[in-house]
UniProtKB/Swiss-Prot annotation:
Pfam families per UniProt: DUF1450 (PF07293)
Recorded family membership: Belongs to the UPF0349 family.
HAMAP family: UPF0349
Name of the molecule in the record: UPF0349 protein SH2012
Organism of this sequence: Staphylococcus haemolyticus (strain JCSC1435)
Length: 81
């Protein structure tokens, strides 16, 4: 089972699309895009994604990507089988 990273399309327009594209090319991560994830207070403040339901944030696309991988590693989602 791979970790699921979910993106709000509005947040992708702020730079999250870069992170989405990077993760989409990672065979060990599943990514989904939604019209809205109902996290408007988080979305309006900066970049974020949901990693298996947990909010992960970053000030820049590179920081968000780094924080997503850090969250995945710390929670070891790859060993849930």
């Amino acid at each position: 089972m791979f970790p699921l990273v979910e993106f709000c399309i509005s947040n992708m327009a702020k730079g999250g699309d870069y992170v989405y594209d990077k993760l989409e090319n990672d065979p060990d991560v599943d990514v989904l895009e939604y019209g809205c994830l109902n996290n408007c207070s988080v979305c309006s403040c900066g970049l974020y994604a949901l990693v298996d339901g947990d909010t992960v944030e970053g000030d820049t696309p590179d920081e968000l990507l780094k924080n997503i991988y850090k969250h995945i590693e710390e929670n070891d989602f790859t060993n849930l089988l």
